[in-house]
Amino acid sequence: MPELPEVETVRKGLAKHLQGGTISSVELRREGLRFPFPKDMEDRLTNRRIKAINRRAKYLLIRLDDNSTWLVHLGMTGKFTLFADESEFEEIAKHDHVIIRMENGAIAVYNDPRRFGVMDLINTGGEHNHRLLARIGCEPLSKKFNATSLSKSLENKKSPIKTALLDQRIVAGLGNIYVCEILNRAGVSPRRTASSVASSVGRAESRCERIVVETKQVLTEAIAAGGSTISDFAAVDGDLGYFSHSFRVYGREGEPCLT
């Protein structure tokens, strides 16, 4: 599943080419993905100008000029591919489920073989009350994510720290890949009880502080590298993510330790 760096990579690619443009048509090639598409989604997106493209956790928030937001989650295998015009978009592939044509001729195609993605239309500003976003924790690259806030979230957790960091209610956007890398760099065992990590706050270089520092560092490096391509992730221009070449632990079982 695309994690925060991969979704941010997609966001940046879409924003570069689509932000400020107007949608001329939308073609839905099935009735939904993980859930049915919103009623009249084609009509509601057509002739709308894209004001901005934001991200919350692993969700894309495409802001439209009618005060609505097109919410997109890529699921396990969802991806957007951009084409400059019809001459580049030669034929519709088997799993191309949503085709967006822009007034300037550009085409954005959403492809999702496993169909675990999600699309919805919501009122801009009301996303915090949406059933998929209401309980999501703070953004790990924000100032709100610090040793104190992390400690407070972990203090009563009896689960392993790895499990806790995967909980989207504690911190947004992390998945198995990046939690493994973060804990390795922070020198914290993934099996350590989350509450014991919280209890170290106040000591010199607490475990929470190390986790926060390494979270921000790993995510920043991963975004700069275009995310991680394990199987089928690609940016909107087809480029692969190269942070996978920097893995110290994920997918390296049985190989020499790099720590």
Where are these regions (language model features)?
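Basic, nucleic-acid-binding surfaces and adjacent catalytic neighborhoods in DNA/RNA-processing proteins
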Residues: 22-40, 54, 88, 151-259
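Alpha-helical structural motif
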Residues: 3-6, 10, 19, 37, ...
